[in-house]
Amino acid sequence: MEKLIEPILVDELELELELEINSTPLKYKEITKDIKNILLIDDSVAQSDILFNSVNSNTLGIEYSNHSDRDELITLLTDNFQTIDRIGFVFNDGMINSKQFMNSELFFTKEDLEDGMTEYSPNVKFVLDIIKNFKITNIDYLVCNGLKESNWVRYFNLLNKETGVIVGASDNETGNLRYGGDWIMETTNEDVVNIYWNSNISNYTTITCDNKYHK
């Protein structure tokens, strides 16, 4: 009788291929003594190059992707700043409730928003630590219609509750008025365009909404 050859069992874990995602380096310009604001710009937002190149002399524009590394950003900030007045985030509203920030991880998880949480996911902890460590007074989310998303409102409230930071966010389209948006943070009724940008921002011909995306 022909002898059956038994299959060799291999631990499935040994067969798993680990996916290496190459970190996308942060893009930024010379850091001067006049800088007191940070503007983080997602490189997938429409016309991100104009947003990046139009920052004013008080603002350090940093272009990132969701594959960028938190450690690189915290090292950059720690090596160059003791305090930061305010920080802004510019990204589009595509897949807004599963929006990734750095290290290919979400801005926040559903668990972060549960009552009584004291331990948070990596990017929530990261933002909270930056606010506390650099004594940031204002944080602005320059994305379309953030205030219309209940989970984002809860996230904004979490940041305020944990740190006392003033959160700027919008309930309409964000961008230049002539193209259907504005730069007003409805939570504070503050127009932030001149806080972060110089007059070259007038060349931004779209809004930070995914359905208007074009480069």
Language-model-detected regions and their locations in the chain:
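Short, intrinsically disordered N-terminal pre-domain segments
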Residues: 1-10
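Caspase-like cysteine protease fold
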Residues: 169-213
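Small-residue-enriched, tightly packed secondary-structure blocks
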Residues: 38-41, 45, 51, 60-70, ...
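Catalytic cores of nucleophile-dependent amide-cleaving enzymes
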Residues: 85-86, 92-178
